[in-house]
């Protein structure tokens, strides 16, 4: 077992809560949006960013609801950037599977990426700390500029 796998194993209960919260945050009244998101979430990445949030929280205290809100926000922002990046780079395959724009089209992928970004900001608001919202917005700006 690699060190990263050991960390994932140690954080398994927190990661399970995180993934449940991500799915809840992305629930939509729109059937197509839910279909696209369900398909997208089946191809889970390493979740390094939320793992860093969870490890930091454990080091400095505890993993509570506010920490999970922040971890969800970070993961949603990251995924929004990946979805938008796939459109910009016209990438049709990521993690060995079709991207949203590869499976559907660029129009839908941009809207789904925006949906992820909007929900990242809402999760930032849920932390109750305006600095979290500011950080998400700033990171979003930097990601956009970096893509140019």
What is the predicted function of each stretch?
Residues 16, 23-148:
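Mg2+-dependent prenyl diphosphate-binding active-site environment of isoprenoid biosynthetic enzymes
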Residues 1-23:
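N-terminal amphipathic/basic leader segments beginning at the initiator methionine
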